[in-house]
């Protein structure tokens, strides 16, 4: 999976290999701007051990092969569910993070990455449980959170994350991309 063209400059700003990693990132962007793709590329780059010159996952190593299906060091939580099911992220989903990070990594020194999409859909109890994970992050584990709007988030969650505003394509960028596809 690669970035959209309008995300490339932002990737260089976020570039996880250019700085010391923070334990939690909050990526903010509007619906339809490719925020989930950006978050997935970020998560993949934290797990891949053979990054490209552009500091993205290589797509070829064993870790990348697993990422294309289900990687044992990546947990994705989202409010996307079966029709008729709850559209909120439950406290149980957040509590499972603790169990996930307690499992040993499949490789020595491997990172555990938790990607939570649409965190504004956390229940109140789930938000409080997430806060516990943010306050006491396990070693070698990283949280990537996505949100369209931070106004409904607990200020304490926001304050414990490195916030990053994902880019929105201009009308020209969007047209060019769609024509190329």
Where in the sequence are the language-model features?
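AAA+ P-loop NTPase domains with strong preference for DNA replication initiators
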Residues: 172-181
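P-loop/Walker A NTP-binding region and its immediately flanking N-terminal helices
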Residues: 1-119, 142
């Amino acid at each position: 999976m690669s970035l959209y063209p309008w995300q490339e400059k932002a990737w260089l700003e976020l570039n996880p290999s250019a700085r010391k990693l923070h334990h939690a990132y909050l990526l903010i962007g509007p619906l339809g701007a490719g925020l989930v793709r950006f978050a997935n590329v970020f998560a993949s780059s934290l797990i891949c051990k053979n990054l490209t010159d552009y500091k993205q996952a290589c797509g070829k190593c064993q870790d990348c092969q697993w990422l294309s299906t289900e990687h044992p060091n990546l947990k994705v939580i989202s409010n996307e569910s079966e029709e008729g099911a709850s559209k909120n992220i439950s406290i149980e989903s957040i509590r499972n993070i603790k169990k996930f990070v307690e499992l040993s990594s499949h490789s020595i020194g491997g990172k555990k990455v938790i990607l939570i999409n649409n965190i504004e859909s956390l229940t109140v109890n789930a938000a409080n449980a997430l806060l516990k994970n943010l306050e006491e992050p396990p070693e070698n584990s990283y949280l990537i959170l996505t949100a369209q709007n931070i106004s409904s988030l607990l200020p304490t969650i926001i304050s414990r994350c490195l916030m990053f505003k994902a880019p929105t394509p201009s009308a020209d960028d969007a047209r060019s991309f769609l024509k190329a596809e």
